Regions:
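Conserved N-terminal helical subregion
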Residues: 2-148, 192-208
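Residues in well-ordered beta-strands of folded domains
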Residues: 31, 99, 141-143, 167, ...
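Short, P/G- and charge-enriched loop/turn segments at secondary-structure junctions
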Residues: 51-53, 126-129, 160-164, 237-240
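A short catalytic or substrate-binding loop motif that flags glycine-/basic-rich loops and adjacent residues
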Residues: 92, 166-170
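Short glycine/serine/threonine-biased micro-segments
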Residues: 111-114, 134, 167, 252, ...
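Rossmann-like dinucleotide-binding core of oxidoreductases
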Residues: 136, 155-164
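Short, conserved charged micro-motifs
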Residues: 151
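FAD/FMN-dependent oxidoreductases across multiple families
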Residues: 158, 162, 170-174, 178-183, ...
Length: 264
């Protein structure tokens, strides 16, 4: 949650709903793949310049906080209601009818499609547009508890403070940062595959370990501690003619309208 997003979380009280699971961190450190430092940013400098905190958060905790605040603000949230189709054109009064997997229908004056890269709403408005990888870049995602890392003396200096670390290699990089009240060491491990990856894939863990065998021995040891992981595609959509329907009764926001491939 960069400072611009943190400002909005604070405005609506979502920061209080998430609580300690919004993690503050001290530094952003850039390294070569062998661990040699090449750049350093104290996060306080960024926060002071922008007047807002920079937080790290697991998406589960973010979603839970958003749901809690929405409910206390009077919103009705329906679960087990996966949308399968929508009709936004046939109503004479411009209303939108949504059908769900459970067979229910709901009618609205305005439908906001914030349903991600595989958006059902976007597909209804722009059926010919589909997410695709612009390159062979993709990422493993994994979590290792800080408590496990601290059992190894040679790794403790790397985790004695809460920091964001980046190891940069040729066609590969690793980003790590703390989440879950500073209890979990989250990793995004970028790499390339040919042909490009279109969907989340299960992987052989030895493949992941071999991918980073020449990296800094410290992060390599943490990589070897990963119990399981998946390969995630980094997808792009667009360009779209518009982010709304011709009648302006359906609008796309967020990743449903403009996903970007380089993200952690």
């Amino acid at each position: 949650m960069t400072p611009n997003a943190a400002r909005l979380l604070k405005k609506y009280g979502v920061d209080k709903a998430i609580g300690e699971n919004l993690v503050s961190f001290e530094e952003l450190n850039m390294r070569r793949k062998d661990g040699t430092p090449v750049g350093y940013t104290p996060i306080s400098r960024v926060e002071n310049a922008l007047g807002q905190p920079w937080w790290l958060v697991h998406r589960h905790h973010l979603h839970t906080g958003l749901v809690d605040v929405a409910r206390t603000s009077g919103c009705t949230i329906l679960t087990a209601s996966r949308v399968t189709s929508l009709d936004y054109q046939s109503s004479h009064d411009g209303k939108v009818t949504v059908s769900t997997e459970a067979g229910a229908q709901h009618t609205f004056d305005l439908l906001v499609g914030a349903d991600g890269v595989n958006s059902v709403v976007r597909k209804a408005i722009f059926p010919s547009i589909a997410p695709a990888p612009p390159t062979g870049n993709c990422a493993y995602r994994a979590i290792v508890p800080y408590a496990e890392i601290r059992k190894h003396a040679e790794l403790r200096p790397l985790v004695e403070k809460l920091t964001m670390e980046v190891w940069m290699g040729h066609d590969a990089y690793i980003i790590s940062y703390p989440i879950s009240a500073g209890k979990d060491f989250n990793m995004v491990l970028s790499h390339h595959r040919d042909p490009p990856v279109h969907q989340v894939q299960e992987i052989d863990m030895q493949e992941l370990r071999d991918e980073y065998k020449d990296f800094d021995p410290r992060i390599k040891k943490i990589v070897d501690m990963i119990p399981s992981a998946q390969r995630w595609p980094l997808l792009y959509v667009g360009p779209l003619e518009s982010w709304c329907s011709p009648k302006k009764n359906v609008v796309l926001i967020g990743v449903s309208s403009a996903p970007f491939p380089h993200t952690y």
